[in-house]
Regions:
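Short loop/turn segments that connect beta-strands within beta-propeller blades
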Residues: 54-59, 97-101, 136-140
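Beta-strand-rich domains and repeat architectures in extracellular enzymes and scaffolds
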Residues: 18-50, 65-77
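Blade-loop segments of beta-propeller domains
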Residues: 59-95, 101-113
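A short helix->beta-strand "capping" segment at the edge of beta-propeller domains
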Residues: 12-26, 56-61
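Short coil/turn segments that connect the beta-strands within blades of beta-propeller domains
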Residues: 36-37, 80-81, 120-121, 165-166
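Surface loop/turn motifs at the tips and blade-to-blade linkers of beta-strand repeat domains
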Residues: 20-25, 64-69, 105-111, 146-153
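Single conserved hydrophobic/aromatic residue that forms the stacking wall/gate
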Residues: 1-11
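Conserved beta-strand positions in repeat-built beta-propeller and related beta-rich domains
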Residues: 41-46, 83-90, 123-129, 170-171
């Protein structure tokens, strides 16, 4: 696993808005990934959680998969033609075929699910603590736990994860 970078390494810079895209106001975004020319979004809220794709020109959302009403959707990751979505407190991850939306698998895991990303081989999951878990995508079994620290102190409440240039970024 790559080194995990604390806030002393955060890039602080100015920015400019290059484009504004419409977005459904009712979508409670929990996971976001741009892949294969489409913006994928995992949303939360009990009874309303979905995985959807968004048309950047119109903001139109196309529901790809709907979670059971009792599940609160969280982070998503696309890997090997599959979409993985965590749930917050249901201890479940869903795996869908990225072309058809068919549910392929359902995995159980301990604790909460918050953020999810991939390096193209493994999955990396946060659970709201200072830990990031390396997961086997075929079994969803934890292979490694990495505790993120900053100046010797644990950095709790890690949420959304992104894999960028060999590093995991978290908010």
């Amino acid at each position: 696993m790559p080194s995990l970078v604390g806030s002393e390494m955060c890039i602080r810079d100015s920015y400019s808005v290059r484009a504004v895209h419409p977005h459904p106001a009712t979508s409670y975004t929990q996971g976001l990934q741009y892949a294969d020319g489409r913006l994928w979004e995992g949303t939360g809220q009990h009874g309303e959680s979905v995985v959807q794709t968004l048309d950047l020109a119109t903001g139109r959302a196309e529901v790809f998969a709907r979670l059971p009403k009792q599940d609160f959707g969280e982070g998503i990751a696309l890997l090997d033609g599959k979409v993985y979505q965590l749930t917050w407190q249901s201890n479940k991850a869903y795996v869908y075929d990225a072309r058809t939306g068919e549910k392929l698998k359902e995995f159980r895991y301990p604790g909460e699910g918050w953020g999810l990303t991939t390096d193209g081989k493994k999955l990396y999951m946060s659970d709201g603590t200072a830990n990031i878990y390396t997961l086997d995508p075929a079994t969803f079994k934890r292979e490694k736990r990495t505790t993120v620290t900053l100046r010797g102190e644990t950095l709790n409440f890690l949420n959304e994860l992104e894999w960028i240039d060999g590093k995991i970024w978290a908010n």
